[in-house]
């Protein structure tokens, strides 16, 4: 049955306009994004099928292009549309951070870093560079691969901090395993970077580790 034949109060788009996006299920939100279904399936039916295939919304949103476009009802145009929506969401968060001090809203900072790094299939190390009022200047990925004290070069981090004229920064990297517990190498690396950046009067405010669930703040865990 086509969604158009449903009572207005049950249609996802009408429900969103009346009740707000937060009131909709994952399937209803995805159905609005899909707009149309396929033969024998309404957009909501197709959305439920896709969520089942990917075992949830997160895996669907994180899927690469081959995995995404291999599914019924999806294609390159939908993949491009989804990537554009997600990038706009990341930029919206970045603009909010540029207006306020990162210290005043640490949860927002962690959510932004999670949005930047959660989808990365391999370990990456990045910095969030801040001005003298702790407002975000820019986010930059510096290293890809195994993140440890021998792979991440302090001189490169210092070089980028000086290039951005940053007064402080937040270190961050992801754990593709999903477990955010810092390793001994993570702790040692943080110490080395703090010492190197202190020499050029750039302060390390935190080191955030992104995995499944909430990102971990090494400051809040007393590890810095």
UniProtKB/Swiss-Prot annotation:
A Pfam family of this chain: UPF0758_N
Motif (JAMM motif): 173-186
Ranges where the MPN domain occurs: 102-224
Keyword Glycoprotein tagged: no
GO molecular function: metal ion binding; metallopeptidase activity
Residues the record lists as binding Zn(2+): 173, 175, 186
Disulfide bridges in this chain: none
GO biological process entries: proteolysis
Signal sequence coordinates: none
InterPro entries, per the entry: MPN, RadC_JAB, RuvA_2-like, UPF0758, UPF0758_CS, UPF0758_N
Keywords per UniProt: Hydrolase, Metal-binding, Metalloprotease, Protease, Zinc
Protein family per UniProt: Belongs to the UPF0758 family.
Protein name: UPF0758 protein PSPTO_0086
Native organism: Pseudomonas syringae pv. tomato (strain ATCC BAA-871 / DC3000)
Lineage of the organism: Bacteria, Pseudomonadati, Pseudomonadota, Gammaproteobacteria, Pseudomonadales
């Amino acid at each position: 049955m086509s969604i158009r034949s449903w009572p207005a109060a049950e249609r996802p788009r009408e429900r969103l306009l009346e009740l707000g996006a937060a009131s909709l299920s994952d399937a209803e939100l995805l159905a609005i994004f899909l707009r149309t279904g396929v033969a024998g399936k309404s957009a909501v039916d197709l959305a439920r099928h896709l969520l089942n295939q990917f075992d949830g919304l997160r895996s669907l949103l994180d899927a690469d292009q081959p995995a995404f476009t291999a599914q019924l009802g999806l294609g390159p145009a939908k993949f491009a549309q989804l990537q554009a929506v997600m990038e706009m969401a990341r930029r919206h968060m970045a603009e909010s951070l540029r207006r306020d001090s990162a210290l005043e809203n640490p949860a927002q900072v962690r959510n932004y870093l999670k949005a930047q790094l959660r989808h990365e299939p391999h370990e990456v190390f990045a910095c969030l560079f801040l001005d003298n009022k702790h407002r975000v200047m820019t986010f930059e990925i510096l290293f890809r691969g195994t993140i440890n004290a021998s792979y991440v070069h302090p001189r490169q981090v210092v070089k980028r901090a000086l290039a951005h004229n940053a007064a402080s920064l937040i270190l961050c990297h992801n754990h593709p395993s999903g477990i955010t517990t810092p390793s001994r190498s993570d702790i040692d690396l943080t110490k080395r970077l703090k010492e190197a950046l202190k020499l050029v009067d750039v302060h390390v405010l935190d080191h955030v580790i992104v995995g499944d669930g909430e990102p971990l703040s090494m400051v809040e865990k007393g590890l810095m």
